[in-house]
Amino acid sequence: MAKRNAVVVTHTRLRQTGTVVAEAVSQLRVAGFEVAIIDNTEAPDFGVQPPCVSDDTEIVVVLGGDGTILRAAELVHCTQVPILGVNMGHVGFLAEFESFQIDEAIRRVSTHDYSIDERMIAHVDVWLPGATKPIEDWALNDITLERADRGKMVELSIRVDDVEMNSFGADGVIVSTPTGSTAYAFSAGGPVMWPNVKALQLIPLAAHALFARPLIIGSGSTFTIDILDDSMSEGWICCDGRRQRALPQGTRVMVRESRDTLRLARLSGVPFTNRLVSKFDLPVVGWREHARNEASSQSLHHGHTFPAAAYAAGVAVAVAGDAGVAGTDPDKPGERDGKAGA
């Protein structure tokens, strides 16, 4: 019988304070897996690829929130090993199961009862002034280029396929994948992109300009962002809220679709739309309908009343029933990582 290998990725706090990690590891071993545990969430340096899990790893099970999943993504980026997220955080957009379903998750993993969802990754080349080759990195969620000096603006020029589109002073810009469109990009006013869309979006952050709106490009195009030589501030680049470094004036940053993808294990066929409504608790009943229901609860219709509260509760139950469980997280570095990717 072939050896089956699994890796459990979690964070130190969860491993030290709870029994969930021990329970998951025990169940995987009972199912015939040899299990390695990784709880080091320290971010590698920008442009440095940390050691990946071995190619004979069958699956990486993540116990945590989306921040822990982003850490796990660094371990599988150079492999075809899928990630299964079990949400131990708050929203857990990338996770597939909730913590109380861990028994079911392990059972499904042990019987290969899951499908693979391939997610687009963004590739970034950073050309420092005078450099003959770029520093390369990548992101599952987003790449941010922000001001290094919090009291000054960073002056940027934006190009698409080598055609200049805009230039402005700003707090920075976000370049997001579809997966990251429900994270920092969403908070900054960007649109939600469905995960199967092959596109990248750029969202300016507090740009001092009359025309500074989000831009969406197709997968064959490239965003080029130059930090102008006379910029008041240097830049600061960060991939997925983890790998980061300072960028001097005159740096060029180029972002395009990566040839690689990230593989997420999916245990259900719940559509992304249901996940979006459920995780964001979207108000599917508009204010006008609420007002009508409030009015109708005060009067009788054919001898019956229809209280608005009961209606709203019914909608909530219906949404929860349709949404199933999908899977931001206190263990993420940085304030912005409280927003999950989808």
Swiss-Prot record:
Pfam families: NAD_kinase, NAD_kinase_C. Keywords: ATP-binding, Cytoplasm, Kinase, NAD, NADP, Nucleotide-binding, Transferase. One of its GO terms (biological process) is NAD metabolic process. It comes from the Bacteria. It is found in: Cytoplasm. Its EC number is 2.7.1.23. Its main location: cytoplasm. It is an enzyme of class 2 (transferase). NAD(+) binds at residues 66-67, 71, 141-142, 152, 171, 182-187, 206. It catalyses: NAD(+) + ATP = ADP + NADP(+) + H(+). One of its GO terms (cellular component) is cytoplasm. Belongs to the NAD kinase family. This is NAD kinase. The gene is nadK.
